[in-house]
Amino acid sequence: MTDITAIIAIAERIHPDLFERPDVFAEKMRLFPDGCRVLVGDEGIVGYGLAHPWKQHQIPPLDCFLASLPDDADCLYVHDVAVLPFARGGVAAAYIRTLEQLARSSGAVLALVSVYATRSLWEQFGFRSVTTNAELRAKLACYGEAATYMLWDLAAAQSSRPPTPMTPSESADQAQT
């Protein structure tokens, strides 16, 4: 993923209150390129996804450099999925399926912060809300009122996986983590 200009333009449109500098995006891409994708539609780049190894029940700070990824990471953290409104209808779902396979190959859990009241969307994939402690609740506050920390335990979901969502008519790409 190299088109930082398009990524930043999409981020500014989708996440106007969750600003992150271009250098912060670039660092995440450099630290874990396997988790980063531009999402392409008929019109070109219509979205992006950023994910990287992290620790469960912890949230990487917004607009801050990570410097490195934790050696003892126990989850694949979905930092952001953003798709332009006119292009929603499947491209984000394909990215999440890619992350699912990546996490399964390493035995990791998937984690994210659901924003903009998208919790029910993430639940369709298999993510579940997690009870948070005071420290995590304080960090969630900077994401807005509807922010919810969620995990998808892929090992537990193996036997009871919900049906994969996202028919073209569904609004899956409204997922903005």
Task: Outline where the language-model segments fall.
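Conserved active-site alpha-helix within GNAT-family acetyltransferase domains
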Residues: 105, 116-142
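Active-site rim helix/loop that mediates acceptor-substrate recognition in acyltransferases
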Residues: 14-46, 50-68
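Conserved acyl-donor/pantetheine-binding loop and adjacent beta-alpha core of acyl/acetyltransferases
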Residues: 48-82, 87, 97, 134-146, ...
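Short hydrophobic/aromatic beta-strand or adjacent loop that forms the aromatic wall/cage
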Residues: 34-36, 144-151
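A short beta-loop-alpha structural element at the N-terminal edge
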Residues: 1-7
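Conserved GNAT acetyl-CoA-binding A-motif
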Residues: 96, 101-115
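Glycine-rich phosphate-binding loop
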Residues: 90-91
